[in-house]
Curated annotation (Swiss-Prot):
Record keywords, A-Z: ATP-binding, Cytoplasm, DNA damage, DNA recombination, DNA repair, DNA-binding, Nucleotide-binding, SOS response
Localization: Cytoplasm
Predominant location: cytoplasm
Binding annotation for ATP: 74-81
The UniProt record lists the keyword Transmembrane: no
GO molecular function terms noted in the UniProt entry: ATP binding; ATP hydrolysis activity; ATP-dependent DNA damage sensor activity; damaged DNA binding; single-stranded DNA binding
Superkingdom field: Bacteria
Name recorded for this polypeptide: Protein RecA
Family affiliation: Belongs to the RecA family.
Gene name of the record: recA
């Protein structure tokens, strides 16, 4: 009995010490830098919606955290730029100023508009070198006037010496050093200006790799270290078809591979419609089924014990034409997940 009491007292004492240590760490490194996995304290973090309700829910905090660096990476045509354009539209809805550093020189204004981006208000820069791109990014962050900054992409941030044609050994790892310097400068400023900074990145194959993951993101290790969120987006094999059996889009999985602000390793699945972006109606439909607000029996969709559509595309059309039901479902989903 005496041993049990001693053991219990020791546990209680250790818990108190742990709680005090967590508070000290949060004071030093900021809220969200350390937490218990089942803790809901991270709900207080300020966010900008990702534009995908499924991803907002998976992130656990309702969107991208303000004052943090985020990396979105994945294979070619997986939906990286689409995802960031949705975030831009959401930031603009909140009245924020948004900047897009287009190092790839590939931004499609018509597609951005179709997603909901106000291109008249979007600040755009198309620099011709990596150093210029990162200097412009740092200046915009320092100004404190930008709520969201997107850099597309890390792979296109080419150092000036490479552009000048100097292919010497001294240039090996130059991009990684350039990114490392930028991260050290930007990370401190971002937390003070409360800017959300999104770096889009690409995947490359490791040369001579025989074990483990053969894929690696470009730009060295600094971005991985400094970012608070890393999202891996990939297309699935599933295609989205309309009622005429024509392919109109793809499904993509977004995996949270790193999170300093919530529980990582969750996945969100989104429907990306060609020319339109993420299908919000499709998301509401899927989430409503998860919460049993809508039932599915085979190909039939049922709401309040009545079949209303056969097939997912018809169910989406029904919700599009019945906004009262759509709005009710969205409200219930937001209440459930507190977003």
């Amino acid at each position: 009995m005496e041993n049990n009491k001693k053991e219990n007292n020791k546990k209680e004492n250790n818990l108190k010490i742990l709680e005090e240590t967590i508070k000290e760490v949060e004071k030093q490194f900021g809220k969200g830098s350390i937490f218990k996995l089942n803790s809901n304290n991270n709900q207080s973090i300020e966010t900008i919606s990702t534009g995908s309700m499924s991803l907002d829910i998976a992130l656990g905090i309702g969107g991208y955290p303000k004052g943090r660096i985020i990396e979105i990476f994945g294979p070619e045509s997986s939906g990286k730029t689409t995802l960031t354009l949705h975030a831009i539209a959401e930031a603009q809805k909140l009245g924020g100023n948004v900047a897009f550093i287009d190092a790839e020189h590939a931004l499609d204004p018509k597609y951005a508009q179709a997603i909901g981006v106000n291109i008249d208000e979007l600040v755009l820069s198309q620099p011709d070198s990596g150093e210029k791109a990162l200097d412009i990014a740092t200046s915009l962050i320092k100004s404190g006037s930008i709520s969201l900054l997107v850099i597309d992409s890390v792979a296109a941030l080419t150092p000036e010496s490479e552009l000048m044609g100097e292919m010497k050994d001294i240039n090996v790892g130059l991009q990684a050093r350039m990114m490392g310097k930028a991260m050290r400068i930007q990370s401190g400023i971002i937390s003070k200006t409360n800017t959300v900074v999104i770096y889009i990145n690409q995947l490359r194959e490791k040369v001579g790799n025989f074990y483990g993951n053969p894929e690696v993101t470009t730009g060295g290790k600094a971005l991985k270290f400094f970012c608070s969120l890393r999202l891996d987006i990939r297309r699935t094999a599933e295609k989205i078809k309309n009622n005429n059996d024509e392919i109109i889009g793809v499904k993509s999985n977004i995996k949270i591979v790193k999170s300093k602000v919530s529980t990582p390793f969750k996945t969100a699945t989104v429907d990306i419609i060609y020319g339109k972006g993420i299908s919000k109606i499709g998301e509401i439909l899927d989430l409503a089924i998860d919460l049993n607000l809508i039932k599915r029996n085979g190909a039939w969709y049922n709401y309040k014990n009545e079949n209303f559509a056969q097939g997912k595309e018809n169910a989406k059309i029904f919700l599009q034409n019945n906004l009262e039901i759509y709005n009710f479902l969205e409200e219930q989903i937001r209440k459930k997940y507190k977003i």
